[in-house]
């Protein structure tokens, strides 16, 4: 398995409810060039559907999901990563 790509842009959307994580991601990458890797850190399970759908609809590449380091305050946080095309 290949290592996780290093994100050029990281969006902290933990604690935000749908559709805010995908909106925050879209705003953060608005002026980013193709090839940019962006990761959005989330706690809202709906983002697992929204971010890949956004990537598909905008012609970008969804690279996957990874859990964030577990601690007592993370609320089951995870990161969703995309590559801009």
List each model region and its residues.
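Immediate flanking context of iron-sulfur cluster ligation sites
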Residues: 4-13
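Intrinsic-disorder/low-complexity, polar/charged segments enriched in Ser/Thr/Lys/Arg/Asp/Glu/Gln
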Residues: 8, 35-39, 77-79
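Amphipathic, hydrophobic secondary-structure cores in small proteins
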Residues: 13-63, 67
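Class I SAM-dependent methyltransferase SAM-binding "motif I" and its flanking Rossmann-like core
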Residues: 1
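C-terminal edge-of-domain segments
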Residues: 67-85
């Amino acid at each position: 398995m290949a290592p996780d790509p290093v994100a050029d842009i990281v969006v902290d959307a933990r604690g935000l409810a749908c559709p805010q994580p995908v909106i925050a991601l879209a705003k953060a990458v608005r002026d980013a060039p193709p090839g940019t890797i962006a990761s959005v850190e989330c706690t809202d399970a709906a983002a697992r559907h929204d971010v890949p759908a956004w990537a598909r609809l905008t012609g970008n590449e969804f690279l996957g999901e990874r859990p964030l380091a577990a601690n007592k305050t993370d609320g089951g946080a995870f990161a969703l990563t995309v590559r801009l095309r």
